[in-house]
Design a protein with these regions (language model features):
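Intrinsic low-complexity/disordered segments
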Residues: 9-11, 27, 39-41
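Short aromatic-glycine-(Arg/Gly/Cys) micro-motifs in beta-strand/loop hairpins
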Residues: 1-16
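A short, exposed loop/beta-hairpin motif centered on an aromatic-Gly-Thr core
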Residues: 13-27
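Short, mixed-charge low-complexity intrinsically disordered segments
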Residues: 30, 34-54
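Generic alpha-helical structural signal
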Residues: 3, 27-28
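Generic detector of bulky aromatic hydrophobic side chains
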Residues: 12-17, 45, 49
Length: 54
């Protein structure tokens, strides 16, 4: 598993980040959508997915 940081914004353009452990980028996004209900309905608000290097 790798460590990912998912950056997203809300409707007022406030920036947020959530960290997830996942096997790949797709899974990291899916975990973020489970943990942040807003993202489940608004996945287009995800701005970036960064793989953290060890």
């Amino acid at each position: 598993m790798s460590h990912y940081t998912i950056g997203y914004h809300d409707q007022q353009r406030h920036h947020f980040e959530i960290c997830e452990y996942a096997d790949n980028t797709f899974d990291a996004i899916q975990h973020a959508k489970e943990d942040v209900p807003f993202l489940k309905d608004h996945p287009q608000y995800i701005d970036e997915v960064l793989l953290e290097k060890k």
